[in-house]
Structure formats: structure tokens, C-alpha cells
């Protein structure tokens, strides 16, 4: 019984090793009372309190005394004590009377004194290592009445099944058993024979072991999602090759056959090999060196990829990336980061379902630019529940990109090429059709006062300016067809009051042309044409008979600019051209400006009112392509134009002599304001 008598008449003292004392201290740390532990191991409670005070010293002694011989000898002593009883009815020791047996099992000389080292647990410190497992003789003789049936299996395959905390119980939750140090204390549950799991150590040490295991075996890193697997996921396990663990005869009940019907547990998850597994839930890229072909998942497994986590077999080396992707996958957020667009698109994607995305949906699976991660969906399509959020992000990005003229040009080019079969008036907008014209117009825009007509547009697009109607078509339609707003074209658009209507039809974001063909937008476009017609008529001083040709439409101010004595033919230096006009004592410009300011006040107000009406209609509109960002931008734009339009009127009434120059300056500042708002 391993109990020696001291002097006659004193209580029997147990010769406990430091390992036994540390085990008792650990039971106290795990929540048992000192009294119950002292009663179990047969020492006074005061002695146990003294052990707790000297815990560090005992741990050091336990580390020093942990040798193979000690383990085998201590086990032999315990076995010899009950050997005469044979099979479980014998005297003391491990196979003592049934009512005492459970208490003595807790004193097995397993070492729990320090952090678990896998090699030591497998080979040195296991109490059953001294037995011969080559035959079943010892198993039959010992009977294992007090031990769970697969204790020997746990001892043999300990590297693959380190989480031994009663995880083979059918009703046990595997993830709870894996992390709870109290999950298998049978003085709380009384369900199994062993009084305490060999791994029921403190929570901090068990967490350390979990982290260490996750580093050693990356297949365990996805353990957090064990419960989301279906109960029949046991077929995901693949048996570990027999050469990798110490070859020992398993316990009488076969390890794999007994638990094949149970759910995926931490033990068999650890056994799963990345390369094997017919139905493992991953998009593995096989034969990378040979063919590099992508193995797309089978259709039966594809639906579960939205909710369940993936294995690590195909991941890139970055663990942080894997963690992010697995969190997204478990939360069902995978469509927030769609696969890259395979067409080589350099501009922000056009919102909603444009031909870009339609061509993307046609390819299954999509052409990836990187190895597929768990968050990429098999078909490249967007999940419906997140499509609105994704569209909002795209719209916001596109509206921000319109501030960059290069990105805007690319977006306009791309939208035009994608929709040439739909667009009927694309040929009229010369600045849309020809890339060289777009570049030229971007480089040669002028920022003249509103009375000056754009020379560059007249000179390079003579065929588009045959009549005022077609000229205005060319101005308004590209805006409606998805061309981002021309931020510096002051001469092309006659007055800032027209821009709300142009924007309300185009909404400052690359859009398909089909969207703009609603009755409201066509009405506002025709009204805009009429207003511009009236302005051109009054500026040129022509009669209203017949359409205005470009030669007649170019006003006398343009004639003064085309004069050979005028050195500023590039139309880019505003102050120089104004000074040149004044030096030549050409009074027609100032008179026309005064006329223009008088006659357009009512038309500006009317146009702004139309813009506000259209804004109200847009707010009540249920078209999903109209985003809140666009409405906010349009609201700010109209407000900026209103403020920039009222200040010239006030200054004009206050200073009638200098009305022309002040009005020009104020309108320029108003335009700068709206440009800043955008």
C-alpha cells in the first residue's frame, strides 16, 4: 500500500513523492477544497497548507526527480500491492477494494509540475510506460477497472490526441472539453472511473499548451469553428500514418471504431493531414508546380463555405491574413472583399450591375490574380445580402475618384467603350468618342468669363458644332452618359446655373446611359437647351431665324480673340486676355457682359429652381442606383451655385460701373466653390 508505519501508535504516513504533492496542489488550484484533497490523499490539512506555501520548491524537486526508472518503479510498487487479487478483486494498490479504488487513482505518479512537454508526456512521465503492450496479457490481468477504456490509446497516440479531457464522451461538447480544465473532474460528475483527467491542469497552462499545439499543428488553428461543422463530419478525419506515433496495441475497444460516428473532436482534428481528406472544405490549388490548375470545390460542399471555416491546407503563409479571412468566413462577410476584376480595370468599378460585372458573372470560376482564399466565393458572384453595402462602397469610391481628372478620363473612356451599342448620340459628343480629343480638351481647356465661347471646342469639333442643337447635345449627353464632370471647363458650359441640371441627369458618377432616359431628365435637358439657345442668341446679337452656325455663333469677342494682333491665342491666361481686351479698347465685350448679366438673372433662378425640383424628385425616387452620397453632393452643388449666383447680383446692383469685372470674379469664385464642394 506504500504506507510505512513510523512509531507505533501514530497515524500511518504516506511516502508521497514531490510529484504527488504537486498533483494535490494542482487539484486545489482547480477548485477543490483543501479538506477534501487532504482526506483523499490521507494527509492532514495543515500539511497540505504547508505544501501550498512551498509550491515552487516542490515543483523544482519534482522536475529533478522525474526519471524513467522512478516512474516505472512507482508504478510497479502500486501494481504489486494488488497483484494477488487478480483481475480486480485483489487487495490494495491500484486494484484495491472498489470503494477505495477511485481515491487511489488520483495519486498516479504523473508529473504535472511544469508546462506540458510533449516528448516527456509521451515517453518519460507516463505511468503506464513500464508495461509491455505487445500482448494483451497485461491488459487482461490488470483489468483496467479504474481507468477509462482508451487510457492506453491516449497514452500511445498522445502526440495526436493531447486533448484527453474526457472528450470521448458522446454528450460532451468538444470545444468546451478542449478549453475547460474542470470538464473531466469526476468528483464533480462521477461518470467515469478515473478520478481526474491527466490533463486537468490549471487553465493558464492548458491555454499555453493549446497555443503551442496550434503552432505545431496548423490544422488546429481553425478549432474555434468546430461546432459549426455538421455532426456527421467524422468522415473528414483521415487516419494518421502508423509510422508517426509509437506503435502500440490500442486498448481493447478500438479507438477509431468506437468513435467513428461521433462529431469532429479536437483529437481527430489534430490527426487530420492537410494534403489528404477527400471532402475537406478548402479550395486547394493542386499541382502548383506541374499544371497550376485550380481545383474548384464540389457543388455539395460549396454551400457550406459561406458559414463554416476552412482548413489551412491552401493558405498563404501569413497567419494574420488567415485569421482575418476565417473571421469573415465565420461571420458570413466573404462578399465584402470580392475577387479582383480580371479585365485589368484601372478606374473605379461602375456601380451596380454594369457590363463589367455581367461579364464577370459569366465566368465560373473567375480568373484569380492570387491563390484563392477562403473568403472568395466559388462563382465570383456577390451575396445578395451584402450587395447594397458593396454598391455603396463602389459609389463612394467612384464619386471620390471624379476629383482625379486622369481617373475620370479613364472611367469615361471605359464607360463609352462598354456602351457603344446602346449609346445613340455618342458620335455627337466628340470629346467622348475619341481618346485623343479627350486628352486635347483636357490640356487646352480655358477658364474664361462666361461670355467667351470655347475656341478649342469649336476648332477641334467643327463637325459636332454644325448646329446649336447638336452642339448642346454634345455638351449635355456625355455628362448624362457617364462622363464625370469636367471640373475646369468654364467656357464649355455657359453658366454655373446649368450645371445642376447637367449633374442631376448624370449624378457625378459613371452611369449607364440607359438610366438617364427618363421623362424628367429629357425635359430638363430640353429646357437647358432652350436657355442656352437664348443666351447664344443674345450674346451673338443675331436674329433668331435659322439655327446658329459655328461661324455666326462665334461672337465679336471671339473675333477679337482671333485677331492677329492678339498674342494670347491659347486662351489659358485669363488676366492677360482681359487686359488685352481693355488695351484694344474693345467695348463690345463689356456691353455684351452687361446684357448677359441682365438677361440671365431670371433664367439662372429658373434653372436653379428646376435643379431643386429634380433633387426633390430624386429624393423620392426608389431607383436603387441613386445613392445617398450622390444626393448629398447634388444638394451641396446646388447650394454652392445659389450662393455663387446671388453674390454677383448684389455687387452688380451696388457697383454699376464695374459690374462686368466684379461679376466675372464672383462667378469664378462661385465656380471654385462648387469645385471644392465636389
Curated annotation (Swiss-Prot):
Subcellular location: Nucleus
Single Gene Ontology MF annotation: DNA binding
Primary location class: nucleus
Keywords attached to this entry: Developmental protein, DNA-binding, Nucleus, Phosphoprotein, Transcription, Transcription regulation
A UniProt-annotated Pfam family: CENP-B_N
Single GO BP term: central nervous system formation
Organ and tissue specificity: Coexpressed with danr in the presumptive distal antenna, but not in the leg imaginal disk. Both proteins are also expressed in the brain and the eye region of the eye-antenna disk. First detected in early L3 eye disks in cells surrounding the newly initiated MF. Levels are uniform and high anterior to the furrow, lower levels within and posterior to the furrow. Limited expression is seen in small groups of cells in leg and wing. These appear in the location of prominent sense organ progenitors at relatively late stages of disk development.
Region (Disordered): 232-310, 344-381, 445-528, 541-592, 645-678
Matches recorded under InterPro entries: Homeodomain-like_sf (IPR009057), HTH_Psq (IPR007889), RD_transcriptional_regulator (IPR051839), WH-like_DNA-bd_sf (IPR036388)
Phosphoserine found at: 251, 254
Positions with biased composition (Polar residues): 241-254, 349-363, 449-461, 495-508
Residue span, HTH psq-type domain: 7-58
Any one Gene Ontology cellular component term annotated for this protein: nucleus
Record bears the keyword Cell division: no
Regions of compositional bias (Acidic residues) in chain numbering: 462-478, 657-667
Binding region for DNA: 34-54
Biased composition (Low complexity): 372-381, 570-586
Subunit and partners: Homomers. Interacts with itself, danr, ey and dac to form a complex (or complexes) containing the RD factors.
Function of the protein: Probable transcription factor with a role in the retinal determination (RD) network. Regulates ato expression and is required for normal R8 induction and differentiation. Danr appears to repress Dan expression, but Dan is required for Danr expression anterior to the morphogenetic furrow (MF). Dan and Danr lie downstream of so and require dac function for highest levels of expression.
Protein name: Protein distal antenna
Species name: Drosophila melanogaster (Fruit fly)
Amino acid at each position: 500500500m506504500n504506507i510505512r508505519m513510523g512509531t507505533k501508535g501514530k497515524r500511518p504516513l504516506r511516502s508521497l513523492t514531490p510529484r504527488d504533492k504537486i498533483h494535490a496542489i494542482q487539484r486545489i488550484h482547480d477548485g477543490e477544497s483543501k479538506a477534501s484533497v487532504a482526506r483523499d490523499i490521507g494527509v492532514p490539512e495543515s500539511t497540505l497548507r504547508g505544501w501550498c506555501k512551498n509550491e515552487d520548491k516542490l515543483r523544482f524537486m519534482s522536475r529533478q526527480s522525474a526519471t524513467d526508472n522512478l516512474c516505472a518503479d512507482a508504478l510497479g510498487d502500486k501494481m504489486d500491492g494488488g497483484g494477488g487479487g487478480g483481475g480486480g478483486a485483489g487487495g490494495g494498490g491500484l486494484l484495491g477494494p472498489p470503494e477505495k479504488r477511485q481515491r487511489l487513482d488520483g495519486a498516479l505518479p504523473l508529473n504535472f509540475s511544469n508546462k506540458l512537454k510533449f516528448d516527456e508526456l509521451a515517453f518519460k512521465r507516463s505511468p503506464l510506460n513500464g508495461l509491455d503492450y505487445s500482448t494483451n496479457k497485461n491488459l487482461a490481468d490488470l483489468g483496467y477497472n479504474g481507468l477509462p477504456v482508451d487510457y492506453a490509446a491516449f497514452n500511445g497516440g498522445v502526440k495526436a490526441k493531447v486533448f484527453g479531457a474526457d472528450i470521448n464522451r458522446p454528450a460532451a461538447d468538444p470545444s468546451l472539453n478542449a478549453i475547460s480544465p474542470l470538464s473531466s473532474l469526476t468528483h464533480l460528475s462521477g461518470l467515469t472511473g478515473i478520478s481526474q483527467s491527466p490533463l486537468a491542469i490549471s487553465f493558464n497552462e492548458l491555454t499555453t499548451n493549446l497555443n503551442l499545439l496550434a503552432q505545431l499543428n496548423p490544422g488546429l488553428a481553425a478549432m474555434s469553428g468546430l461546432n459549426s461543422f455538421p455532426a456527421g463530419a467524422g468522415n473528414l478525419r483521415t487516419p494518421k500514418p502508423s509510422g508517426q506515433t509509437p506503435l502500440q496495441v490500442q486498448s481493447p475497444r478500438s479507438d477509431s471504431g468506437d468513435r467513428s460516428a461521433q462529431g469532429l473532436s479536437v483529437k481527430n482534428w489534430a490527426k487530420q493531414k492537410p494534403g489528404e481528406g477527400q471532402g475537406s472544405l478548402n479550395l486547394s490549388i493542386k499541382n502548383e508546380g506541374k499544371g497550376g490548375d485550380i481545383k474548384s470545390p464540389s457543388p455539395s460542399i460549396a454551400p457550406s463555405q459561406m458559414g463554416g471555416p476552412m482548413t489551412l491546407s491552401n493558405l498563404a503563409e501569413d497567419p494574420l491574413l488567415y485569421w482575418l479571412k476565417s473571421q469573415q468566413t465565420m461571420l458570413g462577410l466573404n462578399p465584402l472583399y470580392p475577387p479582383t476584376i480580371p479585365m485589368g480595370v484601372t478606374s473605379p468599378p461602375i456601380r451596380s450591375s454594369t457590363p463589367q460585372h455581367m461579364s464577370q458573372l459569366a465566368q465560373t470560376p473567375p480568373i484569380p490574380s492570387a491563390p484563392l482564399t477562403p473568403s472568395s466565393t466559388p462563382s465570383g458572384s456577390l451575396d445578395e445580402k451584402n450587395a447594397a453595402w458593396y454598391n455603396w462602397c463602389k459609389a463612394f469610391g467612384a464619386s471620390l475618384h471624379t476629383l482625379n481628372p486622369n481617373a475620370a478620363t479613364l472611367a469615361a473612356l471605359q464607360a463609352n467603350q462598354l456602351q457603344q451599342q446602346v449609346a445613340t448620340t455618342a458620335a455627337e459628343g466628340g470629346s467622348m468618342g475619341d481618346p485623343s480629343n479627350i486628352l486635347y480638351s483636357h490640356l487646352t481647356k480655358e477658364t474664361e468669363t462666361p461670355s467667351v465661347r470655347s475656341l478649342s471646342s469649336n476648332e477641334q469639333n467643327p463637325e459636332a458644332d454644325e448646329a446649336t442643337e447638336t452642339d448642346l447635345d454634345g455638351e449635355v449627353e456625355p455628362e448624362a452618359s457617364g462622363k464625370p464632370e469636367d471640373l475646369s471647363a468654364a467656357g464649355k458650359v455657359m453658366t454655373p446655373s446649368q450645371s445642376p441640371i447637367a449633374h442631376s441627369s448624370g449624378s457625378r458618377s459613371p452611369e449607364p446611359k440607359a438610366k438617364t432616359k427618363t421623362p424628367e431628365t429629357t425635359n430638363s435637358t430640353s429646357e437647358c437647351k432652350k436657355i442656352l439657345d437664348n443666351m447664344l442668341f443674345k450674346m451673338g446679337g443675331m436674329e433668331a431665324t435659322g439655327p446658329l452656325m459655328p461661324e455666326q455663333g462665334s461672337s465679336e469677342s471671339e473675333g477679337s480673340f482671333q485677331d492677329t494682333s492678339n498674342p494670347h491665342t491659347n486662351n489659358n491666361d485669363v488676366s492677360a486676355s482681359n487686359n488685352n481686351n481693355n488695351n484694344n479698347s474693345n467695348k463690345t465685350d463689356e456691353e455684351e457682359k452687361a446684357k448677359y448679366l441682365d438677361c440671365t438673372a431670371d433664367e439662372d433662378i429658373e434653372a436653379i429652381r428646376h435643379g431643386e425640383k429634380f433633387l426633390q424628385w430624386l429624393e423620392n425616387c426608389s431607383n436603387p442606383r441613386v445613392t445617398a452620397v450622390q444626393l448629398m453632393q447634388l444638394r451641396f452643388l446646388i447650394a454652392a451655385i445659389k450662393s455663387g449666383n446671388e453674390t454677383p447680383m448684389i455687387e452688380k446692383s451696388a457697383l454699376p460701373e464695374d459690374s462686368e469685372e466684379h461679376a466675372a470674379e464672383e462667378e469664378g469664385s462661385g465656380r471654385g466653390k462648387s469645385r471644392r464642394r465636389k
